[in-house]
Amino acid sequence: MQQYLDLMKHILAEGVDKSDRTGTGTRSVFGYQMRFDLSKGFPLVTTKKCHMRSIIHELLWFLKGETNIAYLRENKVSIWDEWADDNGDLGPVYGAQWRSWPTQSGDAIDQISQVIAQIKAQPDSRRLIVSAWNVGELDKMALAPCHAFFQFYVADGKLSCQLYQRSCDVFLGLPFNIASYALLTMMVAQQCDLALGDFVWTGGDTHLYSNHMEQTVLQLSREPKPLPLMTILRKPESIFDYQFEDFELTNYNPHPHIKAPVAV
């Protein structure tokens, strides 16, 4: 994951200091892209230990269309706790937009089912897109979507995915985002009987928080290790039938975890 370390170096060297919604302060660049060949290993950061269990459960939670953190809490995942209300609700965040985007007629669009059907029927379509950025519902969300928009691309029997992330917490959030969308691409590829292509990550406001600088320097002092392997152990009937036990991560030997505060 040298690409990830190179991004950190780029922000430290070329970034500008900015204020932000949380009041923490950031060093930021605008517009950055990384590409990961998914056939060459699973892109999970190795210069610190990442909690893959949380990443998998969060993705399954998105795919369920849920917006209450009860499922996450049941599985000891706390990454959304700071934003939930007293009942555990987050408003119409990712899961709602992915699975039930509201229409003017009062119906809802299941974007995940729709895009998989499109990939199977029209793999050369340039409309293989899922969006979480629903302008009409942003004010109802506990947190506006950071990873806002993704597009699939099929060529030579391989499935690739590009994510546009409008706002990116590089130290804490980005390793989760890369791994999550890489895994989603693997799942969709399996459902569509396609081989793996690339995961392309594109960032808008791409930043390091001012209280993550010491941790960033520590991480940059570490040498990346070989990428792990992610295996999907079975092919369920649909994208919505995967269980946590269907995923096996092997050969992951990261450097120790680095603790850092979350900017809320």
Curated annotation (Swiss-Prot):
One term of GO molecular function: thymidylate synthase activity
InterPro entries linked to this entry: Thymidate_synth/dCMP_Mease, Thymidate_synth/dCMP_Mease_dom, Thymidate_synth/dCMP_Mease_sf, Thymidylate_synthase, Thymidylate_synthase_AS
Record's subcellular location: Cytoplasm
Record's GO cellular component terms: cytosol
Enzyme class: transferase
Active site per database record: C146 (nucleophile)
Residues given in the record as dUMP binding sites: R21, R126, R127, R166, S167, C168, D169, N177, H207, L208, Y209
Pfam families assigned: Thymidylat_synt
Pathway assigned to this chain's UniProt record: Pyrimidine metabolism; dTTP biosynthesis
Gene Ontology biological-process entries: dTMP biosynthetic process; dTTP biosynthetic process; methylation
SUPFAM superfamilies documented for this protein: Thymidylate synthase/dCMP hydroxymethylase
Swiss-Prot/TrEMBL keywords: Cytoplasm, Methyltransferase, Nucleotide biosynthesis, Transferase
Catalytic reactions on record: dUMP + (6R)-5,10-methylene-5,6,7,8-tetrahydrofolate = 7,8-dihydrofolate + dTMP
Binding site residues for (6R)-5,10-methylene-5,6,7,8-tetrahydrofolate: H51, D169, A263
The enzyme's E.C. designation: 2.1.1.45
Family classification: Belongs to the thymidylate synthase family. Bacterial-type ThyA subfamily.
UniProt-listed PANTHER family: THYMIDYLATE SYNTHASE, THYMIDYLATE SYNTHASE 1
Function: Catalyzes the reductive methylation of 2'-deoxyuridine-5'-monophosphate (dUMP) to 2'-deoxythymidine-5'-monophosphate (dTMP) while utilizing 5,10-methylenetetrahydrofolate (mTHF) as the methyl donor and reductant in the reaction, yielding dihydrofolate (DHF) as a by-product. This enzymatic reaction provides an intracellular de novo source of dTMP, an essential precursor for DNA biosynthesis.
Assembly and binders: Homodimer.
Protein name, as recorded: Thymidylate synthase
Species per Swiss-Prot/TrEMBL record: Shewanella sp. (strain W3-18-1)
